């Protein structure tokens, strides 16, 4: 199963990205699961889960922990995520 994470602090963008992902994978036979995070901190606090994601959508401009910082932490735990 393909594991997808969406991390954005604005729900409107989360919903849009989610709909694009659902539309794309809905047309294929690929099984997938999407997890949503509303901050970089919320995403990175679950370090044990960071290793499971195959695709990660990150917002660059987030408060507290921006997308670049979030990506740096993600890479420490999951160098294979895209």
Predicted feature descriptions by range:
Residues 1-4:
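Extreme N-terminal starter segment of soluble prokaryotic enzymes
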Residues 8:
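Conserved acidic carboxylate
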Residues 11-35:
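Two-component/phosphorelay signaling modules centered on CheY-like receiver
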Residues 36-55:
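Acidic, metal-coordinating helix/loop segments flanking the phosphotransfer/catalytic sites
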Residues 39, 65-69:
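Acidic catalytic/metal-coordinating carboxylates
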Residues 48-51, 73-80:
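Conserved phosphotransfer cores of two-component systems
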Residues 62:
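Receiver (REC) domain active-site loop signature in two-component systems and cognate sites
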């Amino acid at each position: 199963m393909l594991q997808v994470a969406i991390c954005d602090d604005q729900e409107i963008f989360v919903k849009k990205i989610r709909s694009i992902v659902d539309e794309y994978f809905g047309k294929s036979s690929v099984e997938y699961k999407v997890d949503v995070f509303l901050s970089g901190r919320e995403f990175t606090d679950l370090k044990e889960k960071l290793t499971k994601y195959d695709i990660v959508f990150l917002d660059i401009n987030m408060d507290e922990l921006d997308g670049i910082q979030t990506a740096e932490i993600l890479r420490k735990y999951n160098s294979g995520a895209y």
